[in-house]
Structure formats: structure tokens, C-alpha cells
Amino acid sequence: MERYTYEIIFTRLDGQPDEIQQHTSEELARECFRLFDKPDSAEMYSKIEFSCHDWETGMDEILETMTF
């Protein structure tokens, strides 16, 4: 099992979570996160967060946030 899981969390305009994508590769997760760094993302989402969960320590860390 991988030590880290990277998550991209999409929050709808009404403030409710819409989707969570999970990745074991930070590089792939960052690439997917950056695909949404466009003005039209604001039409669907109020916020998109990129975070990391460390399974060894149980800690979560927000790495980047896009707020629209």
C-alpha cells in the first residue's frame, strides 16, 4: 500500500462536495488538478482543493486550493 493518497475535492457552487478523485501519484494528481485551473470551472465549482493524506501518520494536508 502506498504511504500517500492525493485527493482532488470539487465543491459545487452551493457549497456541497461534488466529487473526490484519489490518486497515488502526486505528479498525476497535480496534472489533473491543473486541468481545472480555467475560468469556466467557476461555472460549476466554488472551490477545488488538492490535498494529501499520509497513511503512516493519519494526517491530511491541503497542498493547493483554487477558489472561484
List where the protein language model places each region.
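Short aromatic-glycine-(Arg/Gly/Cys) micro-motifs in beta-strand/loop hairpins
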Residues: 1-17, 45
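Surface-exposed loop/edge segments in extracytoplasmic proteins
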Residues: 15-21, 57-62
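Solvent-exposed serine/threonine-rich low-complexity stretches and specific carbohydrate-binding patches
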Residues: 22-25, 66-68
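A short, charged, amphipathic alpha-helix used as a generic interaction element across diverse proteins
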Residues: 23-47
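Short, mixed-charge low-complexity intrinsically disordered segments
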Residues: 38-68
